[in-house]
């Protein structure tokens, strides 16, 4: 049987087409194969980087000083505790350095890794000099980022919450300002081994988020950066410092302390306008205002640490207390002179009562009447021609009017003391002058921002 030439040609054409398609599929790798190749290359690069790597040794050991560049992004600042003299800050802390042992060549220029790789390489032993407590966030995984470029430069970022010490000078409280420092550096490496530098210019090395302030009693004015050397018994260390400048808001204290003190002083001066005879009312005014000032003084100190010096608020309360107490002493003085009679225009004279003249009286029908004496003369010889005088007569009483002096002119009682008149002017005037000097002095004073040098 003989095959037809047409069928044979068609068969050969199909075979040729299939072989061509098959060849193309083998020549172009699929997407899965391409991803598999990248993963393999990535794994080989990491294995090669860690092959013979000793993370106990710093980069450039014995050859050069390791330079660590840092910058900080503040996500949240506050709160600030005056009583404990500390503040809380939440930051993204970035460090960058170069490690020639981690150079690589491959299809990618940057290796983006997580915290697992960070534990296998050398990282700076940075700590916060004035930190009381620092927390590295671990939810849901450790908040750490590591990037390695092909030239061996590393970027290491972590999220931290730091509670740091903020030394405060409260002489100007509550018109005070503070510079809260954040100081960090290497714990074990001296400046001959590891030095720190700011990544960018000072204005951009520390950035605070626009909505990062968590302050109720302060305004965050800005931040400044600096660096220095600290000498300790184990050597000289580089210390990086950031100062956060804070200005206290006075509104809360005006409402809570200053206005009540001013109103209490004014209330104590109301007693000068009361009559000096109003002893109970003026006593209540004096005692009540003194007790009120005592209560305000105690409550104002509760929110502050127990410092050995007087603050601006202490001086204000002390002067207000002196005004209130002086008003009470003024009333005591007025009352003293009133009782002695020196506050009258003239002394009061009480007219003497006329003395009654006693006459011999006899009682007749429950009435008393003066009587005359009966005389019976005896004449010698008993001459009957002579009349015997024996007469008894009742004499009508005459009213005896006592001698009266013309009444003295009535003295007018002066109920307003000269001391009260003087106090009505002197006390408000002196208190106004004090307020003018006080507020002009403290509101225009330049705050002294001091920060102690850290010690290791």
UniProtKB/Swiss-Prot annotation:
Membrane-spanning residues: 254-274, 280-301, 312-333, 422-441
Binding site for 4-aminobutanoate: 94, 157
InterPro entries the UniProt entry points to: GABAA/Glycine_rcpt, GABAAa_rcpt, GABBAa1_rcpt, Gabra-1-6_TM, GABRA1_ECD, Neur_chan_lig-bd, Neur_chan_lig-bd_sf, Neur_channel
A Pfam family matched in the record: Neur_chan_LBD
Cellular compartments annotated: Postsynaptic cell membrane; Cell membrane; Cytoplasmic vesicle membrane
Gene Ontology MF terms: GABA-A receptor activity; GABA-gated chloride ion channel activity
Cross-referenced PROSITE patterns: NEUROTR_ION_CHANNEL
GO BP annotations, alphabetical order: gamma-aminobutyric acid signaling pathway; inhibitory synapse assembly
Main localization (coarse): membrane
Glycosylation site list: 38, 138
Keywords from the UniProt entry: Cell membrane, Chloride, Chloride channel, Cytoplasmic vesicle, Disulfide bond, Glycoprotein, Ion channel, Ion transport, Ligand-gated ion channel, Membrane, Postsynaptic cell membrane, Receptor, Signal, Synapse, Transmembrane, Transmembrane helix, Transport
Signal sequence region: 1-27
Cytoplasmic side: 275-279, 334-421
Annotated S-S bridges: 166-180
Stretches in topological domain Extracellular: 28-253, 302-311, 442-456
Membrane-protein topology: Multi-pass membrane protein
Regulation: Allosterically activated by benzodiazepines, the neuroanesthetic alphaxalone and pentobarbital. Inhibited by the antagonist bicuculline. Potentiated by histamine.
Keyword Zinc: no
NCBIfam families: LIC
Family: Belongs to the ligand-gated ion channel (TC 1.A.9) family. Gamma-aminobutyric acid receptor (TC 1.A.9.5) subfamily. GABRA1 sub-subfamily.
Domain notes: The extracellular domain contributes to synaptic contact formation.
Functional description taken from the UniProt entry: Alpha subunit of the heteropentameric ligand-gated chloride channel gated by gamma-aminobutyric acid (GABA), a major inhibitory neurotransmitter in the brain. GABA-gated chloride channels, also named GABA(A) receptors (GABAAR), consist of five subunits arranged around a central pore and contain GABA active binding site(s) located at the alpha and beta subunit interface(s). When activated by GABA, GABAARs selectively allow the flow of chloride anions across the cell membrane down their electrochemical gradient. Alpha-1/GABRA1-containing GABAARs are largely synaptic.
Subunit structure of this chain's protein: Heteropentamer, formed by a combination of alpha (GABRA1-6), beta (GABRB1-3), gamma (GABRG1-3), delta (GABRD), epsilon (GABRE), rho (GABRR1-3), pi (GABRP) and theta (GABRQ) subunits, each subunit exhibiting distinct physiological and pharmacological properties. Interacts with UBQLN1. Interacts with TRAK1. Interacts with KIF21B. Identified in a complex of 720 kDa composed of LHFPL4, NLGN2, GABRA1, GABRB2, GABRG2 and GABRB3. Interacts with LHFPL4. Interacts with NLGN2.
UniProt protein name: Gamma-aminobutyric acid receptor subunit alpha-1
Species this protein is from: Pongo abelii (Sumatran orangutan)
């Amino acid at each position: 049987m003989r095959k037809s030439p047409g069928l044979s040609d068609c068969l050969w054409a199909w075979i040729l087409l299939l072989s061509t398609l098959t060849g193309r599929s083998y020549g172009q790798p699929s997407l899965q194969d391409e991803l598999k190749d990248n993963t393999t290359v990535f794994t080989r690069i990491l294995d090669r980087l860690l092959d013979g790597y000793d993370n106990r040794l710093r980069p450039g050991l014995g050859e050069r000083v390791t330079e660590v560049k840092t910058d900080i992004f503040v996500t949240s600042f506050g709160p600030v505790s005056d009583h404990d003299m500390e503040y809380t800050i939440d930051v993204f802390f970035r460090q960058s350095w170069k490690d020639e042992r981690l150079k690589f060549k491959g299809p990618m220029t940057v290796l983006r890794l997580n915290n697992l790789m960070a534990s296998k390489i050398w990282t700076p032993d940075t700590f916060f000099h004035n930190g009381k407590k620092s927390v590295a966030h671990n939810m849901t995984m450790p908040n750490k980022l590591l990037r390695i470029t092909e030239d061996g430069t590393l970027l290491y970022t972590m999220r931290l919450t730091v509670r740091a010490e903020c030394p405060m000078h409260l002489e100007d409280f509550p018109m005070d300002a503070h510079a809260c420092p954040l100081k960090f550096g290497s714990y074990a490496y001296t400046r001959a081994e590891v030095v720190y530098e700011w990544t960018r210019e000072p204005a951009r090395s520390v950035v605070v988020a626009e909505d990062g302030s968590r302050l109720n009693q302060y305004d965050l004015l800005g931040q400044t950066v600096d660096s220095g050397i600290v000498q300790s018994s184990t050597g000289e260390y580089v210390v990086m410092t950031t100062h956060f400048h804070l200005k206290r808001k006075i509104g809360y204290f005006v409402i809570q302390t200053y206005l009540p003190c001013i109103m209490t002083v004014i209330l104590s001066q109301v007693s000068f306008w009361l009559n000096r005879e109003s002893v109970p009312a003026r006593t209540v005014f004096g005692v009540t205002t003194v007790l009120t000032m005592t209560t305000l003084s105690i409550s104002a100190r509760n929110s502050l640490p127990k410092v050995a010096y007087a603050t601006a608020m202490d001086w204000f309360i002390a002067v207000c207390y002196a005004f209130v107490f002086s008003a009470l002493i003024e009333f005591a003085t007025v009352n003293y002179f009133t009782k002695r009679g020196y506050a009258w225009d003239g002394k009061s004279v009480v007219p003497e009562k006329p003395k009654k003249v006693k006459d011999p009286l006899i009682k007749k029908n429950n009435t008393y009447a003066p009587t005359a004496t009966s005389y019976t003369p005896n004449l010698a010889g008993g001459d009957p021609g002579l009349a015997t005088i024996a007469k008894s007569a009742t004499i009508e009483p005459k009213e005896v009017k006592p001698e009266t002096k013309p009444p003295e002119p009535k003295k007018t009682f002066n109920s307003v003391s000269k001391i009260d008149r003087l106090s009505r002017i002197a006390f408000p005037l002196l208190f106004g002058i004090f307020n003018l000097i006080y507020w002009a002095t403290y509101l225009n004073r330049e705050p002294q921002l001091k920060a102690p040098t850290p010690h290791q």
